[in-house]
Protein backbone atom coordinates (compact mmCIF):
# COMPACT_ATOMS: atom_id res chain seq x y z
CA UNK A 1 0.00 0.00 0.00
CA UNK A 2 1.30 3.46 -0.90
CA UNK A 3 1.38 5.58 2.26
CA UNK A 4 3.01 8.61 0.65
CA UNK A 5 2.84 9.09 -3.09
CA UNK A 6 5.17 10.76 -5.56
CA UNK A 7 4.97 12.16 -9.10
CA UNK A 8 7.27 9.31 -10.19
CA UNK A 9 5.91 5.86 -10.98
CA UNK A 10 8.96 3.90 -9.86
CA UNK A 11 12.13 4.44 -7.82
CA UNK A 12 15.32 2.37 -8.00
CA UNK A 13 18.05 2.13 -5.40
CA UNK A 14 20.11 -0.05 -3.10
CA UNK A 15 18.35 -1.25 0.03
CA UNK A 16 19.46 0.43 3.24
CA UNK A 17 18.61 -1.88 6.13
CA UNK A 18 21.02 -0.37 8.65
CA UNK A 19 19.31 2.96 9.24
CA UNK A 20 22.41 4.99 8.41
CA UNK A 21 21.99 8.01 6.11
CA UNK A 22 22.77 6.78 2.57
CA UNK A 23 21.82 9.30 -0.13
CA UNK A 24 19.62 7.87 -2.87
CA UNK A 25 19.05 4.53 -1.15
CA UNK A 26 15.75 2.78 -0.49
CA UNK A 27 15.34 2.75 3.28
CA UNK A 28 13.90 -0.55 4.54
CA UNK A 29 12.56 -0.54 8.11
CA UNK A 30 9.93 -2.26 10.22
CA UNK A 31 8.46 1.11 11.18
CA UNK A 32 9.43 4.78 10.94
CA UNK A 33 10.53 6.69 14.02
CA UNK A 34 12.52 9.84 14.79
CA UNK A 35 15.71 7.82 15.22
CA UNK A 36 15.63 7.33 11.42
CA UNK A 37 15.31 11.04 10.62
CA UNK A 38 18.76 11.44 9.03
CA UNK A 39 18.32 8.28 6.96
CA UNK A 40 14.83 9.26 5.81
CA UNK A 41 15.62 12.74 4.53
CA UNK A 42 18.33 11.50 2.12
CA UNK A 43 16.47 8.41 0.88
CA UNK A 44 14.99 8.04 -2.58
CA UNK A 45 12.12 5.95 -1.18
CA UNK A 46 11.06 4.18 1.99
CA UNK A 47 9.63 0.68 2.43
CA UNK A 48 8.17 -0.26 5.81
CA UNK A 49 5.90 -2.91 7.31
CA UNK A 50 3.86 -0.80 9.71
CA UNK A 51 2.28 2.62 9.92
CA UNK A 52 -0.41 4.75 8.34
CA UNK A 53 -0.52 7.60 5.84
CA UNK A 54 -0.25 10.48 8.30
CA UNK A 55 2.25 9.43 10.96
CA UNK A 56 4.91 11.97 11.91
CA UNK A 57 7.70 10.47 9.81
CA UNK A 58 5.28 9.87 6.94
CA UNK A 59 4.48 13.57 7.13
CA UNK A 60 8.20 14.30 6.90
CA UNK A 61 8.36 12.16 3.76
CA UNK A 62 5.33 13.92 2.31
CA UNK A 63 7.04 17.25 2.92
CA UNK A 64 10.16 16.09 1.09
CA UNK A 65 8.39 14.20 -1.71
CA UNK A 66 9.86 10.86 -0.60
CA UNK A 67 7.48 7.99 -1.49
CA UNK A 68 6.62 5.46 1.22
CA UNK A 69 5.34 1.97 0.47
CA UNK A 70 4.07 -0.44 3.11
CA UNK A 71 4.51 -4.18 2.50
CA UNK A 72 3.63 -7.27 4.52
CA UNK A 73 6.08 -7.88 7.40
CA UNK A 74 6.99 -11.28 5.94
CA UNK A 75 8.17 -9.63 2.71
CA UNK A 76 10.53 -7.19 4.40
CA UNK A 77 13.30 -9.75 4.94
CA UNK A 78 13.67 -10.48 1.23
CA UNK A 79 14.47 -6.88 0.32
CA UNK A 80 18.24 -6.75 -0.17
CA UNK A 81 20.54 -5.30 -2.81
CA UNK A 82 19.10 -3.23 -5.63
CA UNK A 83 15.32 -2.96 -5.80
CA UNK A 84 12.70 -1.10 -7.78
CA UNK A 85 9.80 0.38 -5.86
CA UNK A 86 6.77 0.38 -8.17
CA UNK A 87 4.28 2.86 -6.80
CA UNK A 88 1.82 2.24 -9.63
CA UNK A 89 1.68 -1.47 -8.71
CA UNK A 90 2.21 -0.99 -4.97
CA UNK A 91 5.02 -3.53 -5.05
CA UNK A 92 8.80 -3.92 -4.79
CA UNK A 93 10.78 -5.75 -7.48
CA UNK A 94 14.19 -7.24 -6.77
CA UNK A 95 16.85 -5.76 -9.05
CA UNK A 96 16.59 -2.95 -11.57
CA UNK A 97 13.55 -2.69 -13.78
CA UNK A 98 12.71 -0.72 -16.89
CA UNK A 99 11.16 2.54 -15.70
CA UNK A 100 7.42 2.45 -16.19
CA UNK A 101 5.68 5.26 -18.04
CA UNK A 102 4.11 7.75 -15.72
CA UNK A 103 0.56 6.67 -15.04
CA UNK A 104 -2.14 9.32 -15.29
CA UNK A 105 -3.35 10.25 -11.85
CA UNK A 106 -5.78 12.74 -10.42
CA UNK A 107 -5.12 16.30 -11.53
CA UNK A 108 -3.24 18.32 -8.91
CA UNK A 109 -5.32 20.74 -6.92
CA UNK A 110 -5.73 24.34 -7.97
CA UNK A 111 -5.20 27.21 -5.56
CA UNK A 112 -7.29 29.74 -7.48
CA UNK A 113 -9.73 30.16 -4.59
CA UNK A 114 -7.14 29.97 -1.80
CA UNK A 115 -5.99 33.22 -0.21
CA UNK A 116 -3.27 31.95 2.13
CA UNK A 117 -1.04 28.88 2.33
CA UNK A 118 1.02 28.00 5.40
CA UNK A 119 3.64 25.48 4.25
CA UNK A 120 4.64 22.66 6.59
CA UNK A 121 8.44 22.30 6.50
CA UNK A 122 11.16 20.24 8.14
CA UNK A 123 14.06 22.69 7.89
CA UNK A 124 15.46 25.68 5.97
CA UNK A 125 15.94 23.55 2.84
CA UNK A 126 12.18 23.26 2.42
CA UNK A 127 11.67 27.02 2.80
CA UNK A 128 14.32 27.67 0.17
CA UNK A 129 12.79 25.13 -2.22
CA UNK A 130 9.30 26.61 -2.02
CA UNK A 131 10.50 30.18 -2.45
CA UNK A 132 12.54 29.10 -5.48
CA UNK A 133 9.48 27.77 -7.31
CA UNK A 134 8.81 29.44 -10.64
CA UNK A 135 6.30 30.88 -10.96
CA UNK A 136 6.14 31.70 -7.29
CA UNK A 137 3.05 30.60 -5.36
CA UNK A 138 1.84 34.02 -4.26
CA UNK A 139 -0.48 32.60 -1.59
CA UNK A 140 2.45 31.30 0.47
CA UNK A 141 2.72 33.77 3.33
CA UNK A 142 3.95 31.60 6.20
CA UNK A 143 5.89 28.47 7.08
CA UNK A 144 5.18 26.01 9.87
CA UNK A 145 7.80 23.96 11.71
CA UNK A 146 7.31 21.48 14.53
CA UNK A 147 9.77 21.99 17.37
CA UNK A 148 10.59 18.28 17.32
CA UNK A 149 11.54 18.49 13.62
CA UNK A 150 13.73 21.52 14.35
CA UNK A 151 15.37 19.41 17.08
CA UNK A 152 16.02 16.54 14.69
CA UNK A 153 17.47 18.89 12.08
CA UNK A 154 19.76 20.49 14.69
CA UNK A 155 20.62 17.11 16.28
CA UNK A 156 19.15 18.13 19.64
CA UNK A 157 17.72 15.78 22.26
CA UNK A 158 15.06 17.84 24.06
CA UNK A 159 14.40 15.53 27.01
CA UNK A 160 18.12 15.13 27.72
CA UNK A 161 18.64 18.89 27.56
CA UNK A 162 15.60 19.98 29.55
CA UNK A 163 16.18 17.49 32.35
CA UNK A 164 19.85 18.33 32.74
CA UNK A 165 18.91 21.51 34.59
CA UNK A 166 18.23 25.18 33.95
CA UNK A 167 21.54 25.79 32.19
CA UNK A 168 20.97 22.86 29.84
CA UNK A 169 17.45 24.06 29.09
CA UNK A 170 18.77 27.50 28.22
CA UNK A 171 21.42 26.07 25.92
CA UNK A 172 18.72 24.01 24.23
CA UNK A 173 16.57 27.10 23.67
CA UNK A 174 19.50 29.05 22.23
CA UNK A 175 20.36 26.18 19.88
CA UNK A 176 16.75 26.10 18.67
CA UNK A 177 16.96 29.82 17.96
CA UNK A 178 20.04 29.24 15.83
CA UNK A 179 18.11 26.63 13.83
CA UNK A 180 15.15 28.97 13.34
CA UNK A 181 17.45 31.76 12.17
CA UNK A 182 18.47 29.58 9.24
CA UNK A 183 14.81 29.42 8.23
CA UNK A 184 14.29 33.14 8.80
CA UNK A 185 17.12 33.85 6.38
CA UNK A 186 15.17 32.05 3.63
CA UNK A 187 11.92 33.99 4.07
CA UNK A 188 10.77 36.43 1.43
CA UNK A 189 9.34 39.86 2.34
CA UNK A 190 5.90 39.47 3.86
CA UNK A 191 6.46 35.88 4.96
CA UNK A 192 6.71 34.62 8.54
CA UNK A 193 7.56 31.47 10.50
CA UNK A 194 5.38 29.62 13.02
CA UNK A 195 6.88 27.08 15.40
CA UNK A 196 4.59 24.58 17.07
CA UNK A 197 5.89 24.01 20.60
CA UNK A 198 7.30 20.62 21.53
CA UNK A 199 4.87 17.73 21.14
CA UNK A 200 7.01 14.62 21.53
CA UNK A 201 5.17 11.42 22.42
CA UNK A 202 6.87 9.11 24.87
CA UNK A 203 7.51 6.32 22.35
CA UNK A 204 9.21 8.76 19.98
CA UNK A 205 11.08 10.48 22.82
CA UNK A 206 12.52 7.14 23.93
CA UNK A 207 14.14 6.70 20.52
CA UNK A 208 16.20 9.92 20.72
CA UNK A 209 16.79 10.24 24.49
CA UNK A 210 19.97 8.73 25.92
CA UNK A 211 20.74 10.46 29.21
CA UNK A 212 17.49 10.25 31.15
CA UNK A 213 14.77 7.61 31.44
CA UNK A 214 11.55 8.07 29.49
CA UNK A 215 8.58 6.46 31.17
CA UNK A 216 6.68 4.17 28.84
CA UNK A 217 2.95 4.62 28.32
CA UNK A 218 0.32 2.08 27.24
CA UNK A 219 -1.11 4.57 24.72
CA UNK A 220 1.36 7.36 23.86
CA UNK A 221 -1.05 9.03 21.42
CA UNK A 222 -3.36 9.80 24.35
CA UNK A 223 -0.58 10.23 26.89
CA UNK A 224 1.56 12.97 28.37
CA UNK A 225 2.48 15.21 25.45
CA UNK A 226 1.53 18.54 23.95
CA UNK A 227 0.12 21.22 26.24
CA UNK A 228 -0.23 18.87 29.22
CA UNK A 229 3.47 17.94 28.97
CA UNK A 230 4.53 21.57 28.53
CA UNK A 231 2.64 22.48 31.71
CA UNK A 232 4.34 19.68 33.63
CA UNK A 233 7.89 20.36 32.39
CA UNK A 234 9.37 22.83 34.86
CA UNK A 235 12.45 23.70 32.79
CA UNK A 236 10.66 24.31 29.50
CA UNK A 237 9.93 27.98 30.33
CA UNK A 238 13.68 28.56 30.74
CA UNK A 239 14.29 27.08 27.28
CA UNK A 240 11.47 29.12 25.77
CA UNK A 241 12.74 32.39 27.22
CA UNK A 242 16.26 31.58 26.02
CA UNK A 243 14.91 30.83 22.56
CA UNK A 244 13.09 34.15 22.29
CA UNK A 245 15.99 36.09 23.78
CA UNK A 246 18.52 34.51 21.43
CA UNK A 247 16.31 35.24 18.42
CA UNK A 248 16.07 38.88 19.43
CA UNK A 249 19.83 39.00 19.94
CA UNK A 250 20.57 37.50 16.52
CA UNK A 251 18.03 39.20 14.26
CA UNK A 252 16.62 42.11 16.24
CA UNK A 253 13.13 43.25 15.18
CA UNK A 254 12.98 40.42 12.63
CA UNK A 255 12.36 38.13 15.61
CA UNK A 256 8.75 39.33 15.40
CA UNK A 257 8.43 37.29 12.20
CA UNK A 258 8.53 34.16 14.38
CA UNK A 259 5.42 33.19 16.33
CA UNK A 260 4.43 30.10 18.29
CA UNK A 261 1.47 27.74 18.59
CA UNK A 262 0.37 25.35 21.36
CA UNK A 263 -0.05 21.68 20.38
CA UNK A 264 -2.52 19.06 21.59
CA UNK A 265 -4.58 21.34 23.80
CA UNK A 266 -8.16 20.86 24.98
CA UNK A 267 -9.59 24.06 26.39
CA UNK A 268 -9.24 27.68 27.48
CA UNK A 269 -8.06 26.71 30.95
CA UNK A 270 -5.02 24.89 29.55
CA UNK A 271 -4.32 27.80 27.23
CA UNK A 272 -4.38 30.41 29.97
CA UNK A 273 -2.32 28.29 32.36
CA UNK A 274 0.27 27.67 29.67
CA UNK A 275 0.57 31.37 28.86
CA UNK A 276 1.28 32.00 32.53
CA UNK A 277 3.68 29.05 32.72
CA UNK A 278 5.67 30.44 29.77
CA UNK A 279 5.60 33.96 31.18
CA UNK A 280 3.84 35.45 28.16
CA UNK A 281 2.20 38.84 28.51
CA UNK A 282 -1.19 39.62 27.05
CA UNK A 283 0.35 41.34 24.04
CA UNK A 284 2.51 38.39 22.95
CA UNK A 285 0.92 36.36 20.12
CA UNK A 286 0.31 32.67 20.79
CA UNK A 287 -1.61 30.42 18.44
CA UNK A 288 -3.53 27.22 19.15
CA UNK A 289 -3.41 23.90 17.36
CA UNK A 290 -6.93 22.47 17.21
CA UNK A 291 -6.58 18.68 16.99
CA UNK A 292 -8.89 17.15 19.62
CA UNK A 293 -12.70 17.13 19.74
CA UNK A 294 -12.53 19.16 22.96
CA UNK A 295 -10.43 21.80 21.22
CA UNK A 296 -12.95 22.01 18.37
CA UNK A 297 -15.69 22.82 20.85
CA UNK A 298 -13.40 25.28 22.67
CA UNK A 299 -12.56 27.27 19.55
CA UNK A 300 -14.65 30.29 20.48
CA UNK A 301 -13.18 30.29 24.00
CA UNK A 302 -9.64 30.19 22.62
CA UNK A 303 -10.46 33.33 20.67
CA UNK A 304 -11.85 35.06 23.75
CA UNK A 305 -8.72 34.06 25.68
CA UNK A 306 -6.52 35.82 23.13
CA UNK A 307 -5.34 33.12 20.73
CA UNK A 308 -3.69 34.95 17.84
CA UNK A 309 -4.55 32.30 15.24
CA UNK A 310 -5.85 28.75 14.99
CA UNK A 311 -4.32 25.82 13.12
CA UNK A 312 -6.63 22.86 12.57
CA UNK A 313 -4.59 19.66 12.68
CA UNK A 314 -6.78 17.36 10.65
CA UNK A 315 -4.44 14.35 10.92
CA UNK A 316 -4.91 13.95 14.67
CA UNK A 317 -8.45 15.27 14.62
CA UNK A 318 -9.55 12.57 12.18
CA UNK A 319 -8.17 9.73 14.26
CA UNK A 320 -9.95 10.99 17.37
CA UNK A 321 -13.28 11.68 15.68
CA UNK A 322 -13.32 8.33 13.89
CA UNK A 323 -11.53 6.30 16.60
CA UNK A 324 -9.04 5.14 13.96
CA UNK A 325 -5.34 5.16 14.85
CA UNK A 326 -3.62 6.99 12.02
CA UNK A 327 -0.53 4.82 12.46
CA UNK A 328 -2.40 1.50 12.26
CA UNK A 329 -2.72 0.14 8.73
CA UNK A 330 -5.44 -2.29 9.85
CA UNK A 331 -7.90 0.59 10.23
CA UNK A 332 -6.67 2.64 7.27
CA UNK A 333 -10.03 2.31 5.52
CA UNK A 334 -11.76 3.89 8.51
CA UNK A 335 -9.39 6.86 8.55
CA UNK A 336 -11.32 9.10 6.14
CA UNK A 337 -10.28 12.70 5.54
CA UNK A 338 -13.70 13.55 4.07
CA UNK A 339 -15.97 11.82 6.58
CA UNK A 340 -19.10 13.92 7.34
CA UNK A 341 -18.21 14.07 11.04
CA UNK A 342 -14.74 15.35 10.19
CA UNK A 343 -16.08 17.99 7.83
CA UNK A 344 -18.61 19.08 10.45
CA UNK A 345 -15.81 19.49 13.01
CA UNK A 346 -13.67 21.47 10.57
CA UNK A 347 -16.62 23.66 9.65
CA UNK A 348 -17.38 24.35 13.31
CA UNK A 349 -13.78 25.31 14.09
CA UNK A 350 -13.49 27.60 11.08
CA UNK A 351 -16.84 29.29 11.71
CA UNK A 352 -16.15 29.84 15.41
CA UNK A 353 -12.68 31.19 14.72
CA UNK A 354 -13.87 33.58 12.07
CA UNK A 355 -16.66 34.68 14.38
CA UNK A 356 -14.02 35.57 16.95
CA UNK A 357 -11.99 37.51 14.41
CA UNK A 358 -9.11 35.01 14.48
CA UNK A 359 -7.47 33.55 11.34
CA UNK A 360 -8.01 29.80 10.94
CA UNK A 361 -5.66 27.60 8.88
CA UNK A 362 -6.81 24.08 7.94
CA UNK A 363 -4.29 21.37 7.06
CA UNK A 364 -5.16 19.58 3.83
CA UNK A 365 -3.56 16.74 1.94
CA UNK A 366 -3.06 17.63 -1.71
CA UNK A 367 -5.93 15.36 -2.76
CA UNK A 368 -8.32 17.14 -0.40
CA UNK A 369 -7.55 20.78 -1.20
CA UNK A 370 -10.38 21.45 -3.64
CA UNK A 371 -12.81 19.31 -1.63
CA UNK A 372 -12.13 21.35 1.51
CA UNK A 373 -12.23 24.69 -0.29
CA UNK A 374 -15.64 23.88 -1.76
CA UNK A 375 -17.13 22.65 1.51
CA UNK A 376 -15.52 24.74 4.25
CA UNK A 377 -15.82 28.49 4.86
CA UNK A 378 -12.06 29.00 4.73
CA UNK A 379 -9.52 30.18 2.21
CA UNK A 380 -6.53 29.53 4.49
CA UNK A 381 -4.81 26.17 4.15
CA UNK A 382 -1.75 24.34 5.42
CA UNK A 383 0.08 22.10 2.94
CA UNK A 384 3.25 20.01 2.81
CA UNK A 385 6.18 21.21 0.73
CA UNK A 386 6.22 18.48 -1.92
CA UNK A 387 2.46 18.58 -2.50
CA UNK A 388 2.56 22.36 -2.88
CA UNK A 389 5.41 21.94 -5.38
CA UNK A 390 3.24 19.58 -7.46
CA UNK A 391 0.42 22.11 -7.42
CA UNK A 392 2.78 24.89 -8.49
CA UNK A 393 4.29 22.85 -11.33
CA UNK A 394 0.84 21.87 -12.57
CA UNK A 395 -0.19 25.53 -12.51
CA UNK A 396 2.88 26.46 -14.56
CA UNK A 397 2.08 23.72 -17.10
CA UNK A 398 -1.52 24.91 -17.37
CA UNK A 399 -0.39 28.50 -17.85
CA UNK A 400 2.05 27.46 -20.59
CA UNK A 401 -0.64 25.40 -22.33
CA UNK A 402 -3.09 28.31 -22.14
CA UNK A 403 -0.49 30.69 -23.59
CA UNK A 404 0.25 28.28 -26.44
CA UNK A 405 -3.46 27.86 -27.14
CA UNK A 406 -3.90 31.62 -27.10
CA UNK A 407 -1.03 32.11 -29.53
CA UNK A 408 -2.46 29.46 -31.87
CA UNK A 409 -5.88 31.06 -31.72
CA UNK A 410 -4.39 34.48 -32.42
CA UNK A 411 -2.44 33.11 -35.40
CA UNK A 412 -5.54 31.43 -36.80
CA UNK A 413 -7.52 34.65 -36.32
CA UNK A 414 -4.94 36.70 -38.21
CA UNK A 415 -4.82 34.13 -41.01
CA UNK A 416 -8.59 34.20 -41.22
CA UNK A 417 -8.63 37.98 -41.42
CA UNK A 418 -6.12 37.89 -44.26
CA UNK A 419 -8.17 35.35 -46.15
CA UNK A 420 -11.24 37.46 -45.64
CA UNK A 421 -9.35 40.46 -47.03
CA UNK A 422 -8.40 38.45 -50.11
CA UNK A 423 -4.68 38.30 -49.38
CA UNK A 424 -2.38 35.60 -48.08
CA UNK A 425 1.33 36.43 -48.04
CA UNK A 426 0.63 39.43 -50.28
CA UNK A 427 -1.01 37.47 -53.16
CA UNK A 428 -4.66 37.54 -54.25
CA UNK A 429 -6.67 34.57 -53.13
CA UNK A 430 -7.82 32.47 -56.08
CA UNK A 431 -11.54 32.00 -56.32
CA UNK A 432 -12.68 28.53 -55.44
CA UNK A 433 -13.71 26.34 -58.41
Predicted regions located by residue number:
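Conserved alpha/beta-domain cores
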Residues: 105-401, 432-433
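Generic low-polarity alpha-helical segments
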Residues: 13-15, 27, 82-86, 117-119, ...
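Acidic, glycine-rich flexible loop/linker segments
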Residues: 2-145, 155
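Long, intrinsically disordered low-complexity tandem-repeat segments
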Residues: 403-430
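Short, low-complexity, intrinsically disordered N-terminal peptides in bacterial proteins
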Residues: 1, 428-433
Amino acid sequence: MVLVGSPTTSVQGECNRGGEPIPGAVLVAESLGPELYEAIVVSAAVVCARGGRTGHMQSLCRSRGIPVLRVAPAELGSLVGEVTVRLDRESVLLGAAVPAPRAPGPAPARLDEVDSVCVVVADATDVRAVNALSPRVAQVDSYFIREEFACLSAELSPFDALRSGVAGARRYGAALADELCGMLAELLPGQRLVMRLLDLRSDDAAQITTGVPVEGEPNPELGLHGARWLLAEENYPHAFRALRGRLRELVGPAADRVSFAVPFINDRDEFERLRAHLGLGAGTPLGVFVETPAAVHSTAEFCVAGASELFVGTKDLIQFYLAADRGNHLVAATYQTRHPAVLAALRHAVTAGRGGGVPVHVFALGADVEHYVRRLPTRRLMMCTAELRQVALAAAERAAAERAAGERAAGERVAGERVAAGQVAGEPVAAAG
